Amino acid sequence: MDTINTHQQHVIGLDFGSDSVRALIVNAETGQEVSSSVVYYSRWMKGLYCQPAQSQFRHHPQDYLDAMTSAIQEVLATVPQTLADSVVGIGVDTTGSTPAPIDENGTVLALLPEFEHNPNAMFVLWKDHTSVAKADRINELAHSGKFTDYTRYVGGVYSSEWFWAKAAWVSEQDEQVAKRAFSWVELCDWIPAILADTQHPQKLRRGICAAGHKAMWHESWGGLPEQAFLSAISPTLDGIRDRMFTEVFTSDQAAGYLSKAWAIKLGLPEGIAIAIGEFDCHMGAVGAGAGANDLVKVIGTSTCDILMVESQNVGDRTIHGICGQVEGSAMPELLALEAGQSAFGDMYAWFKNVLMWPLQAYAEHNPDFALTAEEIASELLPMLSQAAEQQGIDQYTPVAMDWLNGRRTPYANQRLKGAICDLNLGSSSPAIFSALVESTAHGAKAIVDCFIEQDVTVERVIAIGGIAQKSPYVMQMCADVIGRDIIVVESDQCCALGAAIFAAVAAGVYPTTKSAQAVMASPVRQTYSPTPKVQTLRAQRYATYRELGQHMEQIAEFHQSQEREDV
């Protein structure tokens, strides 16, 4: 650990991911990342409350509270008490849209004894796609001409991954939850409210990030969609607009201040600033040092892509096929355009699991082999990457479609499925893996093209996250396929770093996010540049990818038509 200056001000960034929460201590005056701790969600790691085959993924709220408490306590245990006393603020980022039903006191229903083990009373994780039918209903209503097109600023297509689809679907599936739910809350708004003891619906401050990108909040129509529209989505939403919110805030503002109870529990000073929460990818862009016309790809199990632009360069235009354009949802002074891929690292994990199945099955009946199987599992993806890189890609390499978890961007459609084509008896595991990696790079290129085709400037592409740090093969593939430099920054915890930057601003250490970012954001680690000699082949294979996508869309439409006939 570097020398620690305990006389300077420090902040904590909390990054709530799909599997774990990370707590990062940062020197607010130098940007030094002092120490961090990661704690996994115990119930989630046991697979509780989830049904992957039905795309149901739920998080118990107690998992978040337990893991957050442990992570902060653990990270503070690594530094002197004088440093803990110098912490002046906490920033929070989370996955999203990850909403949950709350009662009239702001308590998530699963924290009540009668709902403790009810998945419908928990947080509905971002990748839960059980509400596809409700997303279809929202799109139908928004484009019917009977209402304002509330999808205008979320790319023109509402996703089953988002707030209102999930709230409506869960409420229709569970009468008891629908009756008890006073309102709904996003995880990124709930955590700051818990820390500040402002979770009561009348006190709870909501961030513009979640409201604008996922709940169709926009000032041009007075905030949230009108009640008649919400009721048309589902009668279970009757009256909910008055129980939601009318005001939103950017993350350079305080959601509240650390309560006495939480200060004692965590070992931090009472009354320190708690910044307004934001989604992980937005704070990751800030932590990566991004500014106007920089596209930041937060690469993990999926990707979330943030492109920030000057508002006047977009004007009154709406950018189609993306996940929203919201003023101030990342850097407060810039318009943030959100996109993303529903599966990235999950594609590689799926293939790994397919290859490992016979070894794991054998290990179940031969315990002595279990350790060997674990060793193979830990080395499998690096071995595949090395072999795939050595073999390279040519016109005979299989072509894959990266929609194993649906398509987020361009034009959200969670009914779509993945595919691998052009297989033959000579297709090897490395060749198939290469096709899967290429497909995720193709998906990344489709997002860049979606912006450029609508006259939105993309100057730099910045990649953050574990895959960006650990897989040169994947990053070089992305550079070759997209045809642009891919910048990888030094920090391996940019989302938590972005949260820490906002904590510093909310605490008054800096007057603006831009001035805080100039000191605290991560420097560049390395740049991957396109390989000139492969560009012609890449263009040909991307054209094949696009054609395969059209076929997969037709298959999805066929399946949907069959479902309608069966009803």
From Swiss-Prot:
InterPro entries: ATPase_NBD, Carb_kinase_FGGY, FGGY_C, FGGY_N, Ribulokinase. Keywords: Arabinose catabolism, ATP-binding, Carbohydrate metabolism, Kinase, Nucleotide-binding, Transferase. Pathway: Carbohydrate degradation; L-arabinose degradation via L-ribulose; D-xylulose 5-phosphate from L-arabinose (bacterial route): step 2/3. One of its GO terms (biological process) is L-arabinose catabolic process to xylulose 5-phosphate. It is an enzyme of class 2 (transferase). Its EC number is 2.7.1.16. It catalyses: D-ribulose + ATP = D-ribulose 5-phosphate + ADP + H(+); L-ribulose + ATP = L-ribulose 5-phosphate + ADP + H(+). One of its GO terms (molecular function) is D-ribulokinase activity. SUPFAM superfamilies: Actin-like ATPase domain. One of its GO terms (cellular component) is cytoplasm. It comes from the Bacteria. PANTHER family: FGGY CARBOHYDRATE KINASE DOMAIN-CONTAINING PROTEIN, RIBULOKINASE. Belongs to the ribulokinase family. This is Ribulokinase. It comes from Vibrio parahaemolyticus serotype O3:K6 (strain RIMD 2210633). The lineage of its organism: Bacteria, Pseudomonadati, Pseudomonadota, Gammaproteobacteria, Vibrionales. The gene is araB.
